[in-house]
Each structure stands twice: as structure tokens, then as C-alpha cells.
Amino acid sequence: MAVEALLLLSFGGPERPEDVMPFLENVTRGRGVPRARLEEVAQHYLHFGGVSPINALNRDIIAGVERELDEAGIDLPVYFGNRNWHPMVEDTVAEMARDGVTGALVFPTSAWGGYSGCRQYHEDIERARAAVGPAAPHLTKLRQYFDHPLLIEAFADAIRAALERLPADRRDRARLVFTAHSVPVAADAAAGPPADGGELYSRQVADAARLCAAATGFADHDLVWQSRSGPPQVPWLEPDIVDHLEDLAGRGVDAVVVCPVGFVSDHLEVIWDLDNEAKDKAAELGMAFARASTPGTDPRFPRLVVELMREHLDGLAPRRLGAEPGYGCTIDGMPCASGCCAPQRRPAAAGR
């Protein structure tokens, strides 16, 4: 397949107050989510002026990738498309076809396996190509990158910087806590090729957390979850970050560094669930709290994207640190394997 462009594919988010409810309706379409619940989530966006930071952050990543490509002498345009808000991926793939692109690589803003972390991006690709028709370019999704050295290095430096923001007299006893987006237990059980035993998502997150902790010299750490949604009777990955802070306080912990290892950028789930809810809970408990930044704004992140591209462009050897397998690289929306990351009946995800 000829590679003539890169498509950055993401979740999407509102960029003005009047976008909030239509965006949430797109996210939850067909799931029977009550209007009252949508209005509740909308308040999270309106707290920040009705603007999700995710689109601006993705445009910054694209600018960084364009600089890296230019420095490497790689002459390829970079396109931007979203699943749930403008620019919609269907419109972007149509634009690529009009521009004469016949083949492109796709970088998803999720490093993980699982339905929402990987297979749903394959579905986005398949849907967009079907909407465009025979003129649609062939699209190759790049592999999962949860254990790429540049990602781990960026997180490790962010953890060190967060530790320095804690009061000096508490740093030596600070607890390192990693967070990632919770998913239903059944969805995690179905994550990965069936022959791989399931739970690929939580295994990869645990692997990345282990690598980051080792890189920063922490002998021990915790992995917890955040941003769950849906009916309380549906089991999701636990414990929740807020509940875990209460547990730590009960054990005498008075300082934490929280690293959102499951997130590429400081989008709404990070700045609401961690910088508001978790931070407020820590203050209530008398606990010093510092949140590590996400890697999307780190200059190493666009270098990571270009390295993944070069694995296809010039045969660059993949760089990996983890023990868990990684998948995700297929063409035109094909799943990684039969039955891989089979979709569950899902409640609405939290906002971005």
C-alpha cells in the first residue's frame, strides 16, 4: 500500500457551549441514556466554558508531528478526524479522497487494546471508508504503543516533576498511584484475541504502570481506575481513584503522586476527575496531592508518532519495553483477529 498521508484519529469533543449536548447525543446514540444523565455530564463541560481541551491538544500534537516529519525529510500531509465531533472522520476521509490520497497511516490517540481502546477505531475506519465509497483511501492503523520507550520516558519525567511539587517534608513517603479509564469487567474480559486469554487492556495498563514506576525508582505503586459510567449493577474495573484515596488515608498515607497513565492528553476526564474530584478528596483527607502531566504535550510524543510511521515507511524496528503483547495494526478496519475485543452492550463513556 502506498503511504501518502497520516490521519490522526481521536474521540472528539465540543469546542463551544452550544456543541455540548449535540456532542453528548452523538457519544450516547442508541444506548438509551436518560436526558437527565446527559445534562449532568454537560455540566462538567460547562464548568470549563463548554470547551473540551481534546481538539486543541490534538491539533498541537499534529503540529509537532508535522515538525518532526519535516526534520526527517518525510513529505506527508497530516489529517485530523474524530469519532464523535467535528472534524468527523467520515468528512476527513472524504477530504483525503478529494485530495487524491490513495493510502494512509492512521494514528489513534489511544495506546491500548480492548474495544474502546482499539477495535472501535477499526470500526471508525471501516465506517468512514464505507461512507466515502470506492474512492476512499486504504487506511492502515498503527499498532498499540502502550510500552513505547518514548511514552514511558515522558510519563517518568512527569512523575518526577509532580513529586517535586509535593511539600518537601512529605516527598520521601509519597505513594505513587496510576489511573486509567475504567471499563466494564466483561469488556476487559473480551479484550484481545480470544486465544490470548482476555483482559488485554488491564494487563497492558498494569505493564505500562510497572515500567513507569521502575523508571522513576518507586519500589511499589498502585493501579486504580477512574471515569466509570453506567448502571451501578454493571461491574467495572475497580477500585475507583476517589475510593482508593480514602483507603490510603485510612492507612496513614499523607501524600500521593497520581499519574494518569491511561491517557495521552489532559482532556476532560483528566482535568475533571483528577484535578477536581480526586484533588478535592485529597484535600478533604489532609493529603498532599500532585498530578503528573500527560505526554501529549511532551516533545517526545510526536517523535513517537513518527517512529510508528517509520516502521511502515522504511522498516524501522519496533521499540517495545513491555512484557504484554501488543496488536492493533490492520488495514481498512479489519479486526486484529476473529473475535478480537468483541463489543459488549456498553453504557455511555464519560466525556472527553
From Swiss-Prot:
Top enzyme class: lyase
Subcellular location: Cytoplasm
PANTHER family, per database record: FERROCHELATASE, FERROCHELATASE, MITOCHONDRIAL
InterPro entries: Ferrochelatase (IPR001015), Ferrochelatase_AS (IPR019772), Ferrochelatase_C (IPR033644), Ferrochelatase_N (IPR033659)
HAMAP family xrefs: Ferrochelatase
One Gene Ontology MF term: ferrochelatase activity
Similarity annotation: Belongs to the ferrochelatase family.
The organism's place on the tree of life at top rank: Bacteria
Catalysed reactions, as listed in the record: Fe-coproporphyrin III + 2 H(+) = coproporphyrin III + Fe(2+)
Annotated protein name in UniProt: Coproporphyrin III ferrochelatase
Residue positions binding Fe-coproporphyrin III: S52, Y121
Function: Involved in coproporphyrin-dependent heme b biosynthesis. Catalyzes the insertion of ferrous iron into coproporphyrin III to form Fe-coproporphyrin III.
NCBIfam families, per database record: hemH (TIGR00109), PRK00035.2-1 (NF000689)
GO cellular component assignments: cytoplasm
